[in-house]
Amino acid sequence: MARKSLIQRDKKRKKLEQKYHLIRRSSKQEIHKVSLLSEKREFYVKLQSSPRNSAPTRLRRRCFVTGRPRANYRDFELSGHILREMVEACLLPGAIRSSW
């Protein structure tokens, strides 16, 4: 199980990313539209003035049961071993173990 402080930090980052999403996206679009270097610089300053943790690259996908940051399946938002346990216990409808 991941430390609770790391899970809370990621939740805080997710809130910040959602709050500044439109601002960051619009300033990035304006950077690509504008051809003058001085105007581009203004939009870069606006982009850099937003908090560092509001960037989507700072987010880490975590298992919502254990908080484990690695080996996560996007479709289920679960880590590999929890996914396997839940499939074996028939807790995920439609998911079956492969056999060949």
From Swiss-Prot:
Q: What are the subcellular locations of this protein? A: Plastid
- Enumerate the Gene Ontology biological process terms: translation
Ordered alphabetically, the record's keywords are:
Plastid, Ribonucleoprotein, Ribosomal protein, RNA-binding, rRNA-binding
Instruction: Give one GO molecular function term.
Output: structural constituent of ribosome
A GO cellular component annotation here is:
plastid
- Cysteines paired by S-S bonds: none
Would the keyword Ribonucleoprotein be found if you checked this record's keyword annotation?
A: yes
Q: Which InterPro entries match?
A: Ribosomal_uS14 (IPR001209), Ribosomal_uS14_bac/plastid (IPR023036), Ribosomal_uS14_CS (IPR018271)
Functional summary from the UniProt entry: Binds 16S rRNA, required for the assembly of 30S particles.
Q: Which family does it belong to?
A: Belongs to the universal ribosomal protein uS14 family.
| NCBIfam families linked to this entry | PRK08881.1
Q: Subunit info?
A: Part of the 30S ribosomal subunit.
Q: What is this protein called?
A: Small ribosomal subunit protein uS14c
